[in-house]
Amino acid sequence: MRVVFMGTPEFSVPILTAIIGHGYEVVAAYTQPPRPAGRRGLELTRSPVHEKAEQFGIPVFTPKSLKGAEEQDVFASLEADVAIVVAYGLLLPKAILDAPRLGCYNGHASLLPRWRGAAPIQRAIMAGDAETGMMIMKMDEGLDTGLVAMAEKVAITPDMTAGELHDRLSMIGADLMIRALGALERESLALQPQAEEGVTYAAKIDKAEARIDWSKPAKDVHNSIRGLSPFPGAWCEMEINGAVERVKLQRSTLGEGSGAPGTVLDDRLTIACGEGAVRLATLQHSGGKPLPAQEFLRGQRVTKVL
């Protein structure tokens, strides 16, 4: 079976690796173009999928768009049986969707129709969902509206971070995709329509959302911290040894106590919220590495959280 793989971030890599490892012929990998990196933006960094595909000698294509006739002709010339799409980042026009003999199949990190869109992992945690999952669907022209081929549910534990859920769903996605490809080869892949009720959209995370609002209930603050960890990272300003510093918050738990929002309630960094309190467990100085709260506080006194 001739496969075109389309993906960009680290989340996509285990699925690509599994497809290669199970002997499928990956004739091309499509991924986002290299991005400027480094302090001055002078270096170009290739995507994780780009790096992995090159390790296996797979031709890599990095178009900025697939809307043009020339790019669509190149794609069609690959004569793919199927395209596998996992967090690619570009919209696929109808000409691309129709080119592979068996269609295009997408690995999506939610239980559709909940959390259609760009940031389903973060949004599920930020909303306080108790479960999510991984789905394989046959793509159509809508935004994550295609027929569902396979799904697996995953519990979201109370302190689970987006990073932990990301890794879990990525591995589940690899297993599901291999099972889906096998069923597709055997012509036994059953497709079901998504439910019409319960549609929500996982909008891309806005930078403004990363700043913690201590006037919100503790549960919402805790969900924001873990939903934005490790990237982009929730943050706040702290008064440390008399100076105000921006600090990233990577882990937290629900704490006990109350007070004016932003009040430091004890020497274990329990912070009062609009309702209840949150204990900060892992913090990160600007330009530093994540540290457990006890180590973060060594030689430092936090008097106020803004």
Curated annotation (Swiss-Prot):
Residues that, per the record, bind (6S)-5,6,7,8-tetrahydrofolate: 110-113
UniProt keyword Nucleotide-binding, yes or no: no
Keywords: Protein biosynthesis, Transferase
One Gene Ontology cellular component: cytosol
Secretion signal span: none
Catalyzed reactions: L-methionyl-tRNA(fMet) + (6R)-10-formyltetrahydrofolate = N-formyl-L-methionyl-tRNA(fMet) + (6S)-5,6,7,8-tetrahydrofolate + H(+)
Enzyme class: transferase
GO molecular function: methionyl-tRNA formyltransferase activity
InterPro entries listed in its UniProt record: Fmt, Formyl_trans_C, Formyl_trans_C_sf, Formyl_transf_N, Formyl_transf_N_sf, Formyl_transferase-like_C_sf, GART_AS, Met-tRNA-FMT_C
EC number(s) recorded for this UniProt protein: 2.1.2.9
Family: Belongs to the Fmt family.
Chain's role: Attaches a formyl group to the free amino group of methionyl-tRNA(fMet). The formyl group appears to play a dual role in the initiator identity of N-formylmethionyl-tRNA by promoting its recognition by IF2 and preventing the misappropriation of this tRNA by the elongation apparatus.
Protein name: Methionyl-tRNA formyltransferase
Source organism (scientific name): Brucella suis (strain ATCC 23445 / NCTC 10510)
